[in-house]
Amino acid sequence: MQRVRQLFLAAVLATTVFGALTLAPRAALAGGRIVVSDAEFGSYASEKEMNAALKKQGKTTFKGAGSWTLNMMIFLGAGSGGNKINVVYYDVSKHPPDQVNFTEVSVKPDQKIVQLNGQAISSDMGFVKGHKYEVRATRVVGGKEKVYAKTTITLK
């Protein structure tokens, strides 16, 4: 009887763990990633719908005549622990990479997904057509930049 009870408890535990993993938010799987698009991201009825939109809309190259509008879905690797993060642009065509600009974004301390539509950047702000930029979601913690997510884009 003791053996049956142990097997039953092991099966319940395994089922619970497996169920929790399969139903875990996919933000954890995409954590540390930024998807950038030239089309705005909307709201999605399901995770499947959101993933399809991310695949369809995600781009790494953006065309413009000195100005570009970027829309981002930011999947933080961990909650920021603060009320603000910075979206920072580094020109990686230069050595060493040079910080060009940043945008401060309000978040909840435990927030894992940040949707940021309509971010206008231009040559007037220091961006150069033909250059590559690393886009980072960061926060300064203890005097050091902590990176929660990043991607690389090219402006054409």
Enumerate the language-model features and the residues they cover.
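Short, exposed beta-strand-loop hairpins at the edges of beta-sheets
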Residues: 78-79, 123-152
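C-terminal segment of classical bacterial N-terminal signal peptides
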Residues: 15-26
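Short, solvent-exposed, Trp/other aromatic-anchored flexible loops in extracytoplasmic proteins
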Residues: 68-70, 77-78, 106-132
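Sec-dependent N-terminal signal peptides
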Residues: 6-15
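Solvent-exposed serine/threonine-rich low-complexity stretches and specific carbohydrate-binding patches
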Residues: 97-112, 152
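Short, compositionally biased P/S/T/A/G/V-rich stretches that sit at domain boundaries
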Residues: 26-70, 156
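Intrinsic-disorder/low-complexity, polar/charged segments enriched in Ser/Thr/Lys/Arg/Asp/Glu/Gln
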Residues: 67-73, 148-150
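Extended low-complexity, serine/threonine- and proline-enriched intrinsically disordered segments
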Residues: 78-99, 137
